[in-house]
């Protein structure tokens, strides 16, 4: 049995927005509200990033066309006692999918948590932050 950090990608559609900043704010609020309603406040919500195919620069994955926005988001959670990476993926999708019905979820990254054998402290870091 292993413990994993699972990062899921989710496309969130928002309506009645004018700018990409508005779309991001509404999407974060919408996702956070849905997760909190299901008592999933342990899921970390972050804005996704895309890469420009021409210059290679990274930018926030938020696009607005005709007052409708599409925001790419990363949802990060820990999965404990999974039998395999595939099992951790299924658990993460089931847990988050319960709150975000009709939102397609795709695995962006899965990493196994490392534990300090002495006291069980997790040594894995995610984007420079302790998880």
UniProtKB/Swiss-Prot annotation:
InterPro entries: UPF0212 (IPR007564)
HAMAP family registered for this protein in UniProt: UPF0212
Recorded family membership: Belongs to the UPF0212 family.
Protein name: UPF0212 protein TK1194
Lineage: Archaea, Methanobacteriati, Methanobacteriota, Thermococci, Thermococcales
